[in-house]
Regions:
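S-adenosyl-L-methionine
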Residues: 1-142, 182-187, 202-206, 257-285
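Short internal loop-to-helix segment that lines adenine-nucleotide cofactor pockets
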Residues: 74-95, 142-144, 156-158, 174-233, ...
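Short, glycine/acidic-enriched loop or turn micro-motifs at the edges of active sites
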Residues: 101-103, 124, 150-152, 216-220, ...
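Core alpha/beta nucleotide-donor-binding catalytic domains of modification enzymes
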Residues: 131, 135-138, 143-163
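S-adenosyl-L-methionine-dependent methyltransferase catalytic module, highlighting the catalytic core
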Residues: 149, 162-178
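Conserved active-site loop/cleft motifs that coordinate metal ions or position small ligands
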Residues: 211, 236-240, 262-264
């Protein structure tokens, strides 16, 4: 098994960040800000950590509160340039399905320019932040949250989490590819509700998406089995290809449906451009 320092996916705090955390723990202990008293609870409640930015002339606010959430907000415009370009080309009549929405870093700016966004996310902690971001940006009339694991059928499944943290990613649905990632302080497994998105849309009165974003961190195979009909009726797909067999099969299926790759951008490890981890790809009919 690879040493943790050699893992490619996920976040590992730098020495500087770890020193900051040690200092913060000291302050918390000295002033007893650990939530065990009325004062500390009121103090924590009054904290309102947010990051404000602009995207294409529109104001955005994102809930922060930990290093990962702050990083997501600060790198909105630089982490995935292809995604930013894709969003800028959307129009007011588009309906977008975001499979793997996390805390809404892309669902929110998309919602500011399209008719409707369906945001799918399986991590309850991320869903809480996603809801805050939706309300902070006043797009609750254009975002519907599906708090489920997307898969091939409705059932309870085991989900492996790297950590117990807001803004985390790389969760693994039972049977999916486990990406080679850093583990946090509290890796764990819980049972979650899984649903097929095809079955979900067949059972509700909702406009079908014409654009679909898929970023599911190794869970492509089970997601695909429950997304066949929606993929067939869409005209644009934004897909994160992690160089797995499941990703390869997903792309083959898109081509069989008549999609052609229009653009791609390489994904690199977080420690710089030392290792290619895959490609973000845009497919169109």
């Amino acid at each position: 098994m690879k040493n943790d320092l050699q893992k490619n996916w996920g976040y590992r705090p730098s020495l500087g960040r770890r020193l900051i955390r040690t200092f913060c723990k000291l302050i918390i202990n000295v002033f007893r800000l650990n939530g065990r008293s009325k004062f500390s609870n009121e103090f924590i409640q009054m904290l309102d950590p947010k990051f404000e930015t602009q995207f294409d002339g529109r104001d955005l606010q994102f809930r922060t509160g930990n290093g990962r959430l702050l990083w997501r907000a600060k790198t909105l415009l630089t982490e995935e340039p292809l995604m930013i370009s894709w969003i800028k080309n959307m129009n007011p009549n588009d309906v977008v399905l975001d499979v793997g929405a996390n805390v809404g870093m892309y669902a929110i700016p998309i919602a500011q320019r399209v008719k409707m966004v369906y945001a799918c996310e399986l991590d309850p902690l991320n869903i809480a932040i996603l809801k805050e971001n939706i309300v902070l940006n006043a797009v609750q009339d254009r975002v519907v949250v599906f708090p489920i694991a997307c898969g091939d059928s409705m059932k309870l499944v085991d989900i492996k989490f790297r950590d117990l943290a807001y803004g985390d990613a790389l969760q693994s649905i039972a049977g999916g590819d486990v990406l080679d990632s850093h583990l946090g302080e509290l890796p764990h497994t819980t049972k979650n509700l899984q649903m097929s998105l095809d079955e979900l849309f067949n059972g509700i009165d909702a406009i079908r998406p014409n654009k679909i974003k898929i970023d599911v961190d190794g869970n492509e195979e089970t997601v695909l089995r429950g997304l066949v009909n929606l993929l067939s009726t869409a005209n644009e797909i934004y897909f994160e290809d992690s160089f797995t067999v499941a990703c390869k099969n997903f792309i083959i299926f898109l081509v069989e449906l008549g999609f052609q790759e229009q653009e791609c951008a390489e994904i690199f490890s977080k420690d710089g451009k030392s290792k290619s981890l895959g490609f973000n790809r845009i497919f169109k009919k």
